[in-house]
Amino acid sequence: MLTKSFEPRPEPSNTGPAPSSGKPPFMQRQLPQVSVILLSAVLMHPVNAIGAEPDWSLGVYGGKYHDTDPGSFLQGRANFLNQHMLALTASKTLWRSETLPLSLEIDGMIGQQFGLASLTEIAVAPVLRWSGFPWNNTLQTDLRVGPLGVSYTSTVSPLERGPDGNGSRVLNFLMLELAFSLPQMKSREVFVRLHHRCTIYDLLNNYGANGEDFLAVGYRLRF
């Protein structure tokens, strides 16, 4: 009788683990640690969102091609052609100064060009953001500058071919941007961007053609 009373007890220990989770022993051992990490991230996120500047952004912009480099455009020398771009852009803040209104971001874009030629462009560049303008209490204004990046197009644009017909799909990506927002809604920006591909003074090629340039207007949500 004593033996019979103890016989059923081994059964729950043999069958219990299978219906309870079905996970391998390794995952069962690691699950508590993973849960703690995820919980910590969730608890920390609201603090970062409230107590710090936004570090991420998503945006969209559209632009039209002009036939001069950014310097000539700023001097008023530009002719616009029937070549357009629609693009998605995203950025992440990598560093923020503790004493100056200055931060470093990594900015990426993917866009589709259409009009005289149809092609896709992907580009990425480190970008400096300056937010120290004296009128920012009235209109938040940020200057973003990215002189050195990488731009790749799915095909060589006819607007970038030299006299011999050659061109490069990979060129330097340069961007110059002014972003505007209301002081109480700095997470929503309207921006004007000069989007430029170049050879860095014939360093990347010497085909004798200027890279594409677009004057673009866009909207960005920072979070």
Please give the residue ranges for each predicted region.
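Cleavable N-terminal export/targeting peptides
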Residues: 1-53
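Short glycine/proline- and aromatic-enriched beta-strand/turn motifs that initiate or cap beta-hairpins
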Residues: 47-93, 220-221
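Transmembrane beta-strand segments that form the barrel wall of outer-membrane beta-barrel proteins
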Residues: 58-64, 70-75, 103-114, 192-196
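Contiguous hydrophobic segments
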Residues: 64-70, 75-87, 103, 157-180
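Generic alpha-helical scaffold signal
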Residues: 80-84, 98-100, 118-122
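A glycine-rich, hydrophobic loop/mini-helix early in the fold
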Residues: 89-107
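Outer-membrane beta-barrel transmembrane domain signature
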Residues: 94-96, 109-215, 220-223
